[in-house]
Amino acid sequence: MALAVWSERVLELLLKMNNLQHAGCLPFCVQGQRVGWVTQPVAQVLLQSSDIFTLYKEDSGARLELSDRLRTPHQRTRAVQEVMEALRGRGAFPCLQEWSDELYDVKTFFSDPPLLSVERAATPLLGVSRRTVNVNGFLRRGSKIFMWIARRSLTKPNYPGMLDHLAAGGISAGSGVWETVLKECEEEACIPESLASKARPAGTVSYAYEKDDALYLECEFVFDLEVPESFQPHPGDGEVQEFYLWPLDKVRDAIVTQEFEPNCALAVLDFLIRNGHIQPDE
């Protein structure tokens, strides 16, 4: 792929994944703490659907607040879950059709205790940050680096059949970062813990975009895992069809196509930059 074309497509990817404008969005608060953002159309539906949401208007601006009568994380989780299940049944928002039966913790800061937990598919409606782990699996052949790429199962509710990391997944409620790394490596690619434990933290990649009145905010904890030449990943939990071992030139071209899952493409782009495969002028 010509450099000029590739650079233009990278810019398109970055703009697509970072198009969130807070103007017009309402802070979503729990116990007086802002934990997310809600668009006006979503706020209107939530207010009409349940009295657990209240709109407050003050001189400093408006906000959407979860009811204070829900005093515990369990009560908040159950109440919000009931609302989201009802909205899903009505076909109210496209994101709810990706229902996963997986809860994500909602916190003010990552190190804080959770205020509640929310179904993964519903997090964009409340604009709460999702946190994931993304594992770059790679090996070296002389001076060249090759990367393991997964193709997602066609039965996945989101991004079916698209290209992905060797292993990646959301940090579900009650789970930790390292725990999730080991879990996703074993479940998605049958990587034994003896090898997965060699993954090294490489930083974080964050993005925020708006789609269909929903706000997608995510922080990816990125890990690099160098594997031996003899290593061969295998699909484990049915979320992956197959794996490919590609040179970085091919990976570089793939991440700017419609075939690559865009949020994972960002973490791979980060890997390419950190390993000197993309130069500053590119």
Give the ranges of each region predicted by the language model:
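Short aromatic/basic micro-patch
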Residues: L245
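N-terminal leader/linker segments that precede catalytic domains of diphosphate-processing enzymes
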Residues: M1-M162, G170-E186, I191-V240, L248-F260, ...
